[in-house]
Structures are given as C-alpha cells and as structure tokens.
Amino acid sequence: MKRGQVSLLSCREWYAVEMPRPPRADEAFGIYHALNRGNLRATVFHKEGDYVAFEKILGEGLERYQIELLCYQLMPNHYHLVLRPLLDGELSRFMKWIGGTHTMRYHAHYHTQGLGHVYQQRFKSFPIQCDEHFLVVCRYVERNALRAGLVDQAEQWRWGSLWRWLQKPEPTPKLLSAWPISRLPNWTQRVNEALNDKEMEAVRRCAHRGQPYGNDEWAESEARRMNLESTMRPRGRPKKLLIKQNPIKET
C-alpha cells in the first residue's frame, strides 16, 4: 500500500467488524417465529413447483433435526415458520440447513450459480409466549396471503399450515406437529378476521427486532434471561436536550 493510501474495508468486512450479530434465543422447547426474505425482496417462489420443492426441503429438515413445525406460510418472496426445537441450538441448525439446501437447489434448478444471493440475510426470529400470544402469531402467519390480497379466504392459500391442517389426512410430506395449546373455536373464521392494530404493531416489531412476544412481565423476564435486553430498548440516537439560555445583557 502506498504511503497515504487509505485501506477501505468491503461492506461485508465492515459489517463483520463493526456490527456484531445480535444475540438470538435458541433454547429447547421454546416457541419461535422465524422469517426470511428473498434478496432485495425479490421473488423466491416463482411457480407451483418452487413451493412444492420448498415443502419437500422442510420435510427433509424435520426428519434430520429435532424440531417441530407448528405453523407456516410460504409467500412469493418470503416465508414464515413457527417452530419448537427439542434441543438447545436446534433452531439455528435447522434454519441454516433449510436456507443452504434451498439456495443450492434453487441455483441448480434456475442455473443462477454465481449470480447473487437467494436470501437477503440470515433468518430473523423471536421467542413467543405459549398462551394467547402464540395464537396471535399463528393467526398473523396463516392470514399472510389474505392480507396481501392473494386469496379471498385464508384457507384458500395452498402453501401454508391452515390449508394443510384442514386436509384430512394431512398430505405428504407430513409437516405439522400438534400444538402445545388448543386452537380457538372456529379457528378458520378467526384466522380470516384481521388482527387489531395493537397486535399487528407488536408482532411486526418483534419480527423486526427479535424481541420476545408476550405479556410485558414475561417479555422483560425472557429478555433478561436470554440476553436479549438490547431488543427491548428504543432504537435510534437519544434526543438531544434543548437547554434554554437567558440572553446576555449588555452592560
């Protein structure tokens, strides 16, 4: 390097040095919402065969890892999974395998090796309290296609757990595990009903930040226990305090 020349880190190198990854909750028997999106929000599932291929990968992953799939929905450019790992660290291992396997097969099918990433980043996740908050998240996930205007009724979306749950018996590959708590009565009708503004804002905030989703006491307790306190703090720089000064009188 010549004298006076500045060494510039690539964006990825800078991110690795300056922006350490936030902690992630990944404990056995916890319940987690996991999400990933196509790179630059690009379409990942272009046709029916793409959805079928991903569900096949999900089935393979569920056989390979000690983890349960409780709820899911595949959308054209992203997917939602609600999972319960049975071993510590199994959520991350499962999601890493799912993402890597799907990326490899996607590139092989579309002949796009070397043309960029399929997903925009590593998956996002947040822990969920196993009570009515779990049911809210499942309604949020299972009505995703309805909210996006892709169907008129949530149960019409073929690529998700609501449609699959309504089929008797469940089609192969078998993906869904029993829920830890009972569904609300008239579950399909409840999924078709919109979440209220408070519920929507809370779920989206937790998905964005990795913040535990539950009542205030549970969320704060879990954040402390799992070293997720940073997810509970307000984002952005603190506001500057404006100090009113008295004008100096000339003598």
Set out the residue ranges of the language-model regions:
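Short Pro-Cys-Gly-centered "Cys-loop" motif that presents a nucleophilic cysteine in a tight turn
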Residues: 1-75, 84-251
